């Protein structure tokens, strides 16, 4: 399973993880209806502090190729 930190606005396949916020002045928008996750400019989104099952969605393998 691969997770990508949100760091830059417009970055695809970002997942808000670990701690702090999603990049500097960016927030993570979770994709829906087949859309990829993206970092967008906006107030930072707090990342989950725990790493329990279900905290993060897996990135579909077709996005990793």
Curated annotation (Swiss-Prot):
Signal peptide: none annotated. SUPFAM superfamilies: Leech antihemostatic proteins. GO terms for cellular component: extracellular region. The modification Sulfotyrosine is found at residue 63. The keyword Cell inner membrane does not apply. Keywords: Disulfide bond, Glycoprotein, Protease inhibitor, Secreted, Serine protease inhibitor, Sulfation. Residues 55-65 have a biased composition (Acidic residues). One of its GO terms (molecular function) is serine-type endopeptidase inhibitor activity. Disulfide bonds join 6-14, 16-28, 22-39. Residues 1-3 are annotated as: Interaction with thrombin active site. Belongs to the protease inhibitor I14 (hirudin) family. Hirudin is a potent thrombin-specific protease inhibitor. It forms a stable non-covalent complex with alpha-thrombin, thereby abolishing its ability to cleave fibrinogen. This is Hirudin-3B.
């Amino acid at each position: 399973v691969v997770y990508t930190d949100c760091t830059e606005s417009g970055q695809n396949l970002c997942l808000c993880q670990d701690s702090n916020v999603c990049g500097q002045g960016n927030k993570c928008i979770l994709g829906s209806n087949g859309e990829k996750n993206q970092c967008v400019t906006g107030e930072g989104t707090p990342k989950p502090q725990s790493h329990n099952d279900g905290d993060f969605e897996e990135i579909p393998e077709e996005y990793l190729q």
